[in-house]
Regions:
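Alpha-helix termini
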Residues: 55, 80-82, 89, 98, ...
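Short, glycine/charge-rich beta-strand/loop segments that flank catalytic centers
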Residues: 73-83, 149-156
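Active-site loop segments of alpha/beta catalytic cores
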Residues: 1-36, 44-45, 58, 69, ...
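Glycine-rich loop at the start of a catalytic domain that most often binds anionic cofactors/ligands
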Residues: 38-42, 81-92
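Residues forming anionic-ligand binding surfaces in small-molecule and nucleic-acid pockets
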Residues: 107-114
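Segments that shape or occlude catalytic/ligand-binding pockets
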Residues: 37-77
Length: 256
C-alpha cells in the first residue's frame, strides 16, 4: 500500500516505530561531522563544540546539505563532562573533545557530584551550548526535521569521572565503588535529557559504551541492565540506545 508523502520527522518516527514509510529513512543518531563537511559549511572544531551557533549550523547541514531526516548537534561524548567535575580538552581542531582529568581517579576521592548540583550543571558553558544549539535547530526546522538530543549514561560518565582503566579494573577489584559511581551519576542523563526535550529535541540518544571490546556481556547484565530499565522510562520521549563497538553478545539484554 502506498504511503502519503511524509516530512523527515514523520518518516523518522514511523521508522522508529516499525510503521510504513514513504521511502527508507536516512538518518544518523550520532554524528555525520567530518573535515569535508566542516569545510563546506564553514564552522569547524573547536568552535562547533563550544559555541551554539556554529554547533547548530554544522548540525543543520545533515539535513540542509545532505538530506538526512534527522539532525544531531552534540558531536562528541564529553559535552557534559565538565559539568560533573572533569577537565576536557576542547581545543583540538582535528579531534573530538577529550577528557583530561578524572576527579574520582584517586582512590581517596569522594564519589559525589560538584557542589551546587543540579543548578551548577545547567550553568556549565558546554551544557548551555548544547541546549542553545537545540533551540536554534528547533527555530530553524520547526516540526519538519527530527531533532535528536544526546546524553551519556552512567557507564560512560563513569569513564569520564573515574578514568576508563581504573573504572573497568574496579568492576572486579572494587565493584561496590563502581556501583556507587553508577548510582551517583544516574541522575545526570535524566536531567540533561529532560532539558534537551524542553529546548526542542524530539528524541534522546542514550550513549552508554558498555561494549564487548571492554566488558563481558554479563557485566552489562549485572551492573547496568536494571539501571537502564529504571532510568529510560523517566525520559518522556523516544530513547535510542547507542553502544559503540562489538555488541552482538548483549543485544538480547538491550532488548530487555
Amino acid at each position: 500500500m502506498a504511503v502519503d508523502s511524509m516530512t523527515p520527522k514523520e518518516r523518522f518516527i514511523a521508522a522508529l516505530n516499525g510503521q510504513p514509510v514513504d521511502r527508507p529513512c536516512a538518518a544518523s543518531i550520532t554524528s555525520v561531522v567530518n573535515f569535508e563537511l566542516m569545510d563546506l559549511v564553514g564552522p569547524h572544531f573547536p568552535e562547533a563544540n563550544t559555541e551554539p551557533e556554529p554547533m547548530a549550523e554544522l548540525a543543520a547541514s545533515a539535513h540542509d546539505l545532505m538530506g538526512f531526516d534527522s539532525v544531531m548537534p552534540i558531536f562528541g561524548i564529553a559535552q557534559e563532562a565538565t559539568a560533573i567535575g572533569c577537565v576536557v580538552d576542547f581545543s583540538d581542531p582535528d579531534n573530538m573533545p577529550t577528557p583530561q582529568f578524572a576527579p574520582w581517579a584517586d582512590r581517596d576521592a569522594e564519589i559525589r557530584l560538584p557542589d551546587g548540583f543540579p543548578d551548577s550543571f545547567f550553568e556549565d558553558k558546554h551544557v548551555k551550548c548544547a541546549l542553545d544549539a537545540i533551540r536554534l535547530l528547533k527555530s530553524h526546522f520547526g516540526n519538519k526535521v527530527m531533532i535528536l538530543g544526546k546524553v551519556m549514561g552512567p557507564w560512560t560518565l563513569s569513564y569520564h569521572a573515574y578514568n576508563v582503566q581504573e573504572f573497568l579494573m574496579d568492576t572486579i577489584a572494587d565493584p561496590d565503588r563502581v556501583r556507587k559511581s553508577l548510582d551517583t551519576l544516574s541522575q545526570v542523563p535524566i536531567l540533561f535529557a529532560k532539558a534537551q526535550l524542553e529546548a526542542g529535541a524530539d528524541a534522546i540518544v542514550w550513549a552508554d559504551h558498555a561494549t564487548g571490546d571492554l566488558i563481558r556481556n554479563t557485566m552489562y547484565r549485572d551492573f547496568l541492565l536494571w539501571r537502564h530499565q529504571e532510568l529510560v522510562p523517566q525520559v518522556p520521549a523516544p530513547v535510542i540506545l547507542h553502544c559503540c563497538g562489538r555488541s552482538l553478545d548483549r543485544i538480547e539484554y538491550f532488548r530487555e
